[in-house]
Amino acid sequence: MTIQHMEEVGYWHQAHSFVRGNWRNAEESSPMILQKCCHDMDIMLWLADSKCESLSSFGELSYFTEENAPEGAPAYCLDGCPHRDECAFYAPRFYLENLDGYLVCAVTDQTDPEHVLEALKKGPYGRCVFHCDNTVVDHQSVDIKFENQVTASFLMTAFTDQCARRIRLMGTKGEIKGDMDAGTIEIRDFVSGNLETIELHTPANGHNGSDMSMMHDFVRMVGEGRKGKTDAAVSVESHLMALAAEEAKITGQVVNLRGFANENK
């Protein structure tokens, strides 16, 4: 009957990709609710087993703005920032302490300390997070009504430690909780009171193995000439939901999805 779903972006992922990185500016890329959360819309569509009827949304870019820059903070971290010791986003520490991570590969293709530091001096990833040209939100919520009367509440926020998805499905006979980061699914039966925990053993990289799984499935479909479990129309529906959520955020109104789709053909 009800879905509660949260996209925990992670403070470090937000800073890297959506404040300093390629997806920081909605005019140059797309709204964050589309680029980061169309997958979440897809998950909720599949679980609700129904098309979206209408939705509302609220969100803001509240923290990563010029107004919140500490006094004396320069445009680039390496220009003598007086707040480097207490700033979670100080670029040299942010990237140099994670030279083996994938984030630093976006800074430069030569990931030794010398080249990373050089790239941070005047490159986009060396900018103060409060002095960037970012326009996408750092938190947004969406309330969804499906055609079969299932309702869903979705939250996307930058202000978390982990980058993860957590979901709760509330039904008439029990509830299910899913934790992508922990790799667990909990099933509670209302009648017996029994709790079943399922542990999922998935790879830590590539979106928990889903990137490779999609490619394997695509190759099999091409090689065997068969159809996939879903078609492009389902992906279009989830993208429409994300775009309609952005429209609802901007206008402050409840958006009917079919009407929105017809108006934007």
Regions found by a protein language model. Give the residues of each.
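Generic signature of intrinsically disordered, low-complexity segments enriched in small/polar residues
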Residues: 21, 26, 92-93, 97-98, ...
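Generic structural "secondary-structure junction" signal
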Residues: 20, 25, 35-36, 131-132, ...
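C-terminal helical cap and adjacent loop that interface with cofactors, partners, or active-site loops
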Residues: 136-265
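A short glycine-threonine-serine/GTX helix/turn-capping micro-motif
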Residues: 28-35, 129-130, 201-209
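Predominantly a Rossmann-like dinucleotide-binding segment in NAD(P)-dependent oxidoreductases
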Residues: 1-127, 252
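Short, solvent-exposed loop/turn elements at beta->coil junctions and helix N-caps
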Residues: 59-63, 129-132, 157, 233
